[in-house]
Amino acid sequence: MVNNKKKTSSTFNVQVADFIRNHKKEGVAVDDEVTEKLVIPFELEAEQIDDLLERLTDGGISITDREGNPSTKYAVEEIKPEELTDEELLGSNSAKVNDPVRMYLKEIGVVPLLTNEEEKELAIAVENGDLEAKQRLAEANLRLVVSIAKRYVGRGMQFLDLIQEGNMGLMKAVDKFDYSKGFKFSTYATWWIRQAITRAIADQARTIRIPVHMVETINKLVREQRNLLQELGQDPTPEQIAERMDMTPDKVREILKIAQEPVSLETPIGEEDDSHLGDFIEDEVIENPVDYTTRVVLREQLDEVLDTLTDREENVLRLRFGLDDGKMRTLEDVGKVFDVTRERIRQIEAKALRKLRHPSRSKQLRDFVED
């Protein structure tokens, strides 16, 4: 166990060094990339993230969002939900924002933002155990949670649930924040919030739980899939996706298979609610309805034909060919049942079969023989 931890730590240090070297020229890294390549794969606890940020900063790397804005920009946004449309509230997602969300945004929108000096004073007070300062620091950054949470809408959780999970991460950030390291609180809290939300999505959003690092890999693959769709004008092949993501086609197929969502058999089909998906899926264990119906009709026709024979003839055929229990018997076995010789049973059987071959009887069974 200890060796595994040492190996993981060594691998992580190598990855961080490579990350800094690859971004040294630009001096900038996207926050999503930091999360996907460093935070999630190594399942960093949030208290370890500040050390990572410090190492990146010391390495000359600044953290931004995908639009190139500093990752702290969310903390200074004014939220006025009454002036925003659903699309503006949730970015490019098409989900509708309901009244509870708007009410919540209105409530947090009236909380005044903090200046750098106020933030520092509150952080010091929190370290000294001031509960009121802790509450003020958290409330002033609730809109940060909203801004981050809206980037994860459409991944299987309701917007308010994402906000709730993000708020849990925010509270942890308030407890652990160390102002003396020089980071703005919003920079530090962002990672706690993102980690709380991504873990919640991995744990709750899917019927079958998928590890956090795999969830991020799936999300990245889906993004590349969409980009290729726009570039090519058609759905990309696993080979094309693999080339873009620097992995093998087999690995892409494996990820796509993992990404598939289970579908409930109770899923409604059509406009009426009385039809469900399960109604249209064949049960391979149960006998095919057509075969079952054919077998029942054959049994009925056979019984009718056998009724035209004598009782002894009928019973001999039933025993010889196993018509009742599926077990065929020899002439000798049947002879013992009737206490006659096997030759006598052969004669009775031959006479019964001649009768069945007569057109008046055979026509009832001929269709089944031809099928």
UniProtKB/Swiss-Prot annotation:
Residues 331-350 bind DNA. Residues 216-292 are annotated as: Sigma-70 factor domain-3. SUPFAM superfamilies: Sigma2 domain of RNA polymerase sigma factors (SSF88946), Sigma3 and sigma4 domains of RNA polymerase sigma factors (SSF88659). Its main location: cytoplasm. It comes from the Bacteria. A motif (Interaction with polymerase core subunit RpoC) lies at residues 161-164. Residues 137-207 are annotated as: Sigma-70 factor domain-2. GO terms for biological process: DNA-templated transcription initiation. GO terms for molecular function: DNA binding; sigma factor activity. Residues 305-358 are annotated as: Sigma-70 factor domain-4. GO terms for cellular component: cytoplasm. It is found in: Cytoplasm. InterPro entries: RNA_pol_sigma-70_dom (IPR014284), RNA_pol_sigma70 (IPR000943), RNA_pol_sigma70_r1_2 (IPR009042), RNA_pol_sigma70_r2 (IPR007627), RNA_pol_sigma70_r3 (IPR007624), RNA_pol_sigma70_r4 (IPR007630), RNA_pol_sigma_70_r1_1 (IPR007127), RNA_pol_sigma_70_r1_1_sf (IPR042189). Coiled coil: none annotated. Interacts transiently with the RNA polymerase catalytic core. HAMAP family: Sigma70_RpoD_SigA. Belongs to the sigma-70 factor family. RpoD/SigA subfamily. Sigma factors are initiation factors that promote the attachment of RNA polymerase to specific initiation sites and are then released. This sigma factor is the primary sigma factor during exponential growth. This is RNA polymerase sigma factor SigA. It comes from Streptococcus mutans serotype c (strain ATCC 700610 / UA159). The gene is sigA.
